[in-house]
Amino acid sequence: MPLYDDNTDRQTTPYINYLFIALNIFVFVLFQDFGENDRFTYTFSTVPQEIISGHDIQTEPSVLGHSRSGEQIVMPGLEKTPIPVYLTMITSMFMHGSFGHIIGNMLFLWIFGDNIEDKLGHLRYLIFYLLSGIAASLAHVGTCYFLNTSLLIPSLGASGAISGVMGAYVFFFPHRNVTVLILRFTTTVPAFFAVGLWFVLQIISSTALLDGKEGGGVAYGAHIGGFLAGIPIGFILDSWGKPKNPSRDWTPPV
């Protein structure tokens, strides 16, 4: 697990990255009630079938089974979405299902996001993050459609957008030192190893989907799609606005 990276050459304060972290925490605490507000969560999460059809879908709660104490385990139904369904690909980026979910995501965003913002600048980083998250959501929807699974199960979390951040990170800073925790020990490895290993694990874990399994509630398609999308999106935005021929702006000294 990554703990921190080398930021000695960072030149700007990552205001947008801080904003994203604060916004995720704000939504989780005040709107999701620490993950307990199922109605809000099911209203603004991304539902693959809604994205495919372009229409809002509402369903009744369903009983999944019973607990050891005999109580029913009920899965909430899909709620009416007060916004166009395609906008849920943005709202879902700022929602999480549990403490572990948001803590893990915010740790990764804290470690890797500031470097991408420093590289792209504040506005381009904001655009990059949102585009990566949307690309990840589309990858998840495509995976669900292709495998004909989880089409009515809401997906949420910043993981897809953060996967895009990690893709851009390993593209721009492949040899940046990242300190990772392995069992009880810490060691420093280059980014291409730390992030590359994470990506390989996502691919390996995603093979469970091919066997008809649900993947443990993890949207591996979003992780893989976000990671792969983050590289070209980052490259294009980094090139955006730069002079095509910098030599033309050069003037000889007097």
Which role does the model predict for each range below?
Residues 1-254:
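A detector for small-residue-rich transmembrane helices and their helix-helix packing motifs
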